[in-house]
Curated annotation (Swiss-Prot):
The gene is HCA. This is Hemocyanin A chain. Keywords: Copper, Disulfide bond, Glycoprotein, Metal-binding, Oxygen transport, Secreted, Transport. PROSITE patterns: HEMOCYANIN_1, HEMOCYANIN_2, TYROSINASE_2. Gene3D superfamilies: Di-copper center containing domain from catechol oxidase, Hemocyanin, C-terminal domain, Hemocyanin, N-terminal domain. InterPro entries: Di-copper_centre_dom_sf (IPR008922), Hemocyanin/hexamerin (IPR013788), Hemocyanin/hexamerin_mid_dom (IPR000896), Hemocyanin_C (IPR005203), Hemocyanin_C_sf (IPR037020), Hemocyanin_N (IPR005204), Hemocyanin_N_sf (IPR036697), Ig_E-set (IPR014756). Hemolymph. Belongs to the tyrosinase family. Hemocyanin subfamily. Transmembrane segments: none annotated. Cu cation 2 binds at H326, H330, H366.
Length: 631
């Protein structure tokens, strides 16, 4: 066993069966390491939230202790002690942050959260059935147990048409891991490193989630979502049917018609006041610091400053004045049924980064947040032809190579999730949940380009996809459509003088995870190579790269743009980039975001052109692609 493999195995043991009583003897209080002794944390049965300030501060103290450990063995020793008495979710979050940011953990892969906390992904009735089957097997029976995941809703709720997307295991795992890679309490002073454009990435990743959700809504014959816009409006209901096994209690449901109320720490008026102050800062194009200084919201840094302000994170320029609009919104919605805690009810799924994407209100609230960012984008000048053009480079044709040219087929695929690393079934053998998810056929982009110069040109290839028609079958105006464009890929390519053909597989997307490593694979040491690119588990699931489309075939506009890579490139750090798997949504760990352009360029700003033809420059091209769902 290599040193790296040994580290991997030790790390995995920290996450085994966290949802039940910790394995091994608890550490006596007087023997707990003094570095952990004075940290006050949540009780073991409470619901940890990456949005609740007190919980975040507790986790910050824990992961900073882990990161300060003298060496890997010291870290593991501290972590073993911590897991014996700490809240399991708080511990897992803190341990993952440490694994990703400790130098001596380079190459160690964080385990899939869907196996660590399977109870956040698999409905309670399926887990109960698994327990029932496991406890009624004959002694010595080591055969596998497989339970089917049942539906969590029905056709009485129109929103249930989107359950395949909102409740997708890969999507929710991505959201958990993104907030591990980019914790809002990340302190650059402690780590000695600034996470480049972290605030802007917060804006862009969530904007893309909203765009993808609206694409799925149109695929299913639903209207695009109505953004949340009123803190006093009654909200639609949602029931996740998930159980928080560590406490033995359900994530609370939200009945139809409840409105947000004051919680103990924050009033609804605070939320309205923070929104007004942020909007005023956008109108004035500057934010005010605690000392009264003005910080401009310029073209280069404005989105990053706003992202930190709205989330809010440690990089917020003035949290006392601008508050924490995003995080407290999650908390208020999670406790909408018991805002002051008088009934001691558990929160809803909006409290947890591993579950919040299941709730339809997540997308409506984030569209509201995105609308705030769009107000800032309106203050920026419209991209001129000079901002968009790539002199002497033209795209002559764009095609999609699939079984049928320019037609991508989607379908439902069956998959399984191992439960035995989360729960103790008191039997040997595997216990798995069988579920279904959307998937698509593999395809390739074929891009024909012309380099009219006499020298090689380095190009950045940018690929986006958006629906052509709205819910009524009308053409979507370009300025509306720009907010529906989902990024499909972004990569560098060398253009030789003359004609060029660029071929790119959908499986190489800069948006998606290349693969998901299971506990079993990691324990065997698969894909562990010293010095290789580290795997952060952050990235959009490959199976949801393409929207569902419909049975008739739904038309999308495939937009391809070539830009000058010599202008786009940033100066990278030394060595192999870390966590560079899904760089569009997740960036590159410990290095600058690998694109100088604004995230979402060229669709991040208002477009005054009425048609694609009016907007396009020679280095762009539009192709019509059909996405057809096969049931």
């Amino acid at each position: 066993m290599t040193i790296l493999h040994d580290k991997q195995v030790q790390a995995l043991k920290l996450f085994e069966k966290l949802s039940v009583a910790a394995t091994g003897e608890p550490v006596p209080a007087d023997q707990i390491d003094e570095r952990l002794r004075n940290i006050t944390t949540l009780g073991p049965n409470e619901f940890f939230s990456c949005f609740y300030p007190d919980h975040l501060e507790q986790a910050k103290r824990v992961y900073e202790v882990f990161c300060h450990a003298a060496n890997f063995d010291d870290f593991v020793s501290l972590a073993k002690q911590a897991r014996s008495f700490m809240n399991s979710t708080l511990f897992a979050f803190s341990a993952e942050v440490a694994l990703l940011h400790r130098e001596d953990c380079r190459g160690v892969i964080v385990p899939p959260v869907q196996e660590v906390f399977a109870d956040r992904f698999i409905p309670a009735d399926s887990l109960i059935k698994a327990f029932t089957l496991a406890t009624t097997t004959q002694p010595g029976d080591e055969s596998d147990i497989i339970v089917d995941v049942k539906d969590t809703g029905n056709i009485l709720d129109p929103e249930y048409k989107l359950a395949y997307f909102r409740e997708d295991i890969g999507v929710n795992a991505h959201h958990w891991h993104w907030h591990v890679v980019y914790p809002s309490t990340y302190d650059p002073a402690f780590f000695g490193k600034v996470k480049d454009r972290k605030g802007e990435l917060f804006y862009y990743m969530h904007q893309q989630m909203c765009a993808r959700y609206d694409c799925e809504r149109l695929s299913n014959g639903l209207n695009r979502m109505i953004p949340f816009h009123n803190f006093n409006e009654p909200l639609g209901g949602y029931a996740a049917h998930l159980t928080h096994v560590a406490s033995g209690r359900h994530y609370a449901q939200r009945p139809d018609g409840l409105a947000m109320h004051d919680v103990r720490e924050v009033d609804v008026q605070d939320m309205e006041r923070w929104t007004e102050r942020i909007m005023e800062a956008i109108d004035l194009r500057r934010v005010i610091s605690p000392t009264g200084e003005y910080i401009p919201l310029d073209e280069e840094h404005g989105a990053d400053i706003l992202g930190a302000l709205i989330e809010s994170s440690y990089e917020s320029k003035n949290r006392g004045y601008y508050g924490s609009l995003h995080n407290w919104g999650h908390v208020m919605m999670a406790y909408i049924h018991d805002p002051d805690g008088r009934f001691r009810e558990t929160p809803g799924v909006m409290t947890d980064t591993a579950t919040s994407l299941r709730d339809p209100i997540f997308y409506r609230y984030h569209r509201f947040i995105d609308n705030v960012f769009q107000e800032y984008k309106k203050t920026l000048p419209v991209y001129s032809k000079d901002n968009l053009d790539f002199p002497q480079v033209t795209i002559t044709d764009v095609k999609v190579k699939a079984k049928i040219p320019n037609v991508v087929h989607t379908f439902i695929r069956e998959d399984e999730l191992e439960l035995s690393h989360c729960l103790h079934f008191a039997k040997p053998g595997s216990v798995r949940a069988r579920y279904h998810h959307l998937d698509h056929e593999s395809f390739s982009y074929i891009i024909s380009a012309q380099n009219n110069s006499n020298a090689d040109k380095q190009a950045t290839v940018r690929i986006f996809l958006a629906p052509t028609y709205d819910e009524l079958g009308n053409d979507i105006s370009l300025d509306e459509q720009r907010r529906l464009y989902i990024e499909m890929d972004k990569f560098y390519h060398t253009l030789r003088p003359g004609k060029n053909t660029i071929v790119r597989s959908s499986t190489d997307s800069s948006v998606t995870l290349s693969s998901v490593h299971t506990f079993k694979e990691l324990l065997r040491g698969e894909d562990l190579v010293e010095g290789q690119t580290e795997f952060c588990s952050c990235g959009w699931p490959q199976h949801l790269l393409v929207p569902k489309g419909n049975e008739k075939g739904m038309q999308f506009d495939l937009f391809v743009m070539l830009t000058d890579a010599s202008v786009d490139r940033v100066q990278s750090g030394d060595g192999t980039p870390l966590c560079a798997d899904a760089l569009s949504y997740c960036g590159v760990l410990d290095q600058k975001y690998p694109d100088k352009r604004a995230m979402g360029y060229p669709f991040d700003r208002k477009i005054t052109a009425d048609t694609h033809e009016e907007f396009l420059t020679g280095n762009m091209n539009i192709s019509h692609v059909t996405v057809r769902f096969q049931d």
